[in-house]
Amino acid sequence: QTRNFFNVGQARKFMQTTLIAAQIKELLEQNKPSISTRQLYYILKRTIAGLKENTFENQNESDPIIEDVEVSIDALREELGLEPTPKGVFSGLITYKDLRTGDEINCRKMGTAGAAIPANVEPSVMEFKKSEAKFVLVVEKFAVWNVLNQMKFWDKHKCILLTGKGQGERSARRLVSRLNKELKLPVYVFCDFDPYGYYIYSVYKQGSINLAFFSEKSGCPDAKYIGLKHDDVKEFKIPKSNFIRLTEQDLKRLKEIKNYEWFKKKEWQDEIQKAIDFGYKIESDALVSKTIEFMGETYLPKVIKDKDWLD
């Protein structure tokens, strides 16, 4: 979208863009601590002198302009002193250096809590030092990550184990992308057998529809979906007591994602249609009903070894 300085209808947006750009410039030039987009909004919100009008009425006005600035200067907000609120954790065979503090973090020795994924995982802040990992395993749910981490799955199978605790936010997705592209590590994604599990995988792989610019830098196009899959139900004898009937909303969502461009491959069309016909969904947590160790000792090693995945 082009903004014209002489277009009165765009004057407010132009003013807001200038305010945000000036504040970012100050953050960088004065080497101030990074702030959140919410904090940026509060810094810039005020009543304009001589007018009964605020610079910003709510954060819904400032957020899209931040995206515009990112695209305009080809820089992520994390590089501009603006950081998201992370929620993911990871563990495994990697050491990285926090270039702000000089600390080295060994993710092999973070205990049952794991290492928090930093808000800013850009190379200017997070430098990969040592890794013997052979792949990255991304799991949808923290509960699944927690079991695998306690089993030290990452040690036995030489990997980095990561969860975004549901939908991966910016820093989790960007970290996975960096591990894949810079360390040349394959990425395997383990989610629930339901439309939202499929979608979470697609966001790690292709990025978010709403953030195309960020998706170019955070997508992981060769990520593999290793489960749960429809055919796993029979192969691994998942008991019917673990089935949850699909809701009308679930069925609607399955039909929607079946039409997404990145799910057009025959293997995905078949998988989604099988899910619709099956009529049930299954959570990845349900594998513990066989034994608590089943997913870490049997399911995951087998599907990875057999390359039983969807691309």
Name each region found by the language model.
Residues 1-186, 195-311:
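Nucleic-acid enzyme cleavage-core boundary/entry regions
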